[in-house]
Design a protein with these regions (language model features):
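Bacterial Sec-dependent N-terminal signal peptides
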Residues: 1-13
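Bacterial N-terminal signal peptides
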Residues: 11-24
């Protein structure tokens, strides 16, 4: 009878412990690939009351779907909405998020234009209760969930105090920033994956 060989570098007790450790790894620790959804939790800037969430999901060949829910707005008010270059909402007025996310040659404008900033998302309007919802699809030629210069991950979504006029440079005359949230990728089982810095 042939006796099975035993790996001299791994005693039975040690090997069994390692096997249990691998099996016990939580699903939330698994980082998913570039197609995974991302989200942002928006918090009010100093003196403001607006807050909410924004989700970023693949819309297949159409690009990326953005869904936004806000509260704490003035009833009937209209607000500019943009993705900003830096994933940093630490400043009291959110100026740490930098300018609108854009690639070389783009100018501020409306979603219907061909050469608007990648981060131009138009306006949202609050209802009688001060809440607002928006759902829009952004083509992959503007922004994407995948890694690279067009990635939305690691940037910030910002709500402004005034409407975006969709033409004034560089930001549509949309006023102060009243809410800001960093866009993070999610992980399997919930939670947040370590943020991969966006690259321009």
């Amino acid at each position: 009878m042939q006796i099975p060989s035993i790996n001299p570098g791994c005693g039975l007790a040690l090997c069994a412990s390692l096997a249990l450790l691998v099996v016990a790894l939580p699903a939330a620790a698994v980082i998913v690939d570039d197609s995974t959804d991302a989200m942002a939790t928006l918090a009010p800037t100093k003196g403001a009351a607006a807050s909410g969430t924004a989700s970023f999901k693949s819309a297949g060949k159409d690009g990326m779907r953005i869904e936004l829910e806000l509260s704490g707005l003035e009833p009937g008010s209209v607000h500019g909405l943009h993705v900003h270059e830096k994933g940093d909402c630490s400043a009291p007025d959110a100026t740490s998020a930098g300018p609108h996310f854009a690639v070389a040659g783009q100018q501020h404008g409306s979603l219907q234009g061909d050469n608007h900033h990648a981060g131009d998302l138009g306006n949202v309007t609050a209802d009688s209760g001060g809440k607002a919802k928006a759902s829009l699809v952004v083509p992959s030629s503007k922004m994407t969930l995948a890694s690279g210069p067009l990635s939305v991950v690691g940037r910030a979504v910002v709500v402004h105090a005034a409407p975006d006029d969709l033409k004034s440079q560089p930001a549509g005359n949309s006023g102060a920033r009243i809410a800001c949230g960093v866009i993070d990728r999610e992980t399997v089982g919930g939670g947040k994956a370590p943020m991969k810095p966006a690259t321009n």
